[in-house]
């Protein structure tokens, strides 16, 4: 967003939108990686978080780690899936993702990722608001 504001260069617009789409469900698992967003969609429901697991507190807007290479996942210690793998059909030899409290590698909320997501959402809102506030050239009133 800042890069585009300063340089007026739009070469990364498509990449930005693709990342946004991927985080919110246009990915091999068809699920958002953001707890509770979008509303009424497939989002993480059983994150590796004591707040939700023990206290039943929602962490709306929290970005989970997301997929990890299968080769890494298979060598991690201490991962136990507590529920049947609802994404088993979509798992591959390349990458896996589990919406399961027991998988800290793919389903743990991440502070740095959530902070970056907050920036992305704020930038999108600012971009939308500025377009809405300034009338288009040649538009009739």
Q: Residue locations for each model-derived region?
A:
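Aromatic (Trp/Tyr) and acidic
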Residues: 1-138
């Amino acid at each position: 967003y800042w890069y585009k504001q300063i340089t007026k260069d739009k070469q990364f617009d498509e990449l930005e939108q693709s990342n946004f789409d991927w985080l919110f469900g246009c990915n091999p698992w068809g699920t958002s990686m953001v707890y509770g967003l979008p509303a009424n969609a497939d989002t993480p429901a059983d994150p590796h978080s004591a707040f939700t697991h023990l206290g039943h507190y929602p962490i709306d807007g929290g970005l989970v780690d997301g997929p990890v290479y299968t080769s890494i996942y298979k060598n991690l210690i201490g991962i136990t899936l507590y529920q049947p793998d609802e994404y088993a059909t979509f798992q591959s030899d390349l990458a896996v993702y589990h919406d399961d409290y027991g998988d800290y590698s793919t389903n743990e909320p991440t502070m740095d990722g959530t902070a970056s997501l907050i920036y992305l959402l704020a930038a999108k809102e600012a971009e939308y608001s500025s377009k809405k506030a300034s009338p288009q050239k040649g538009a009739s009133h």
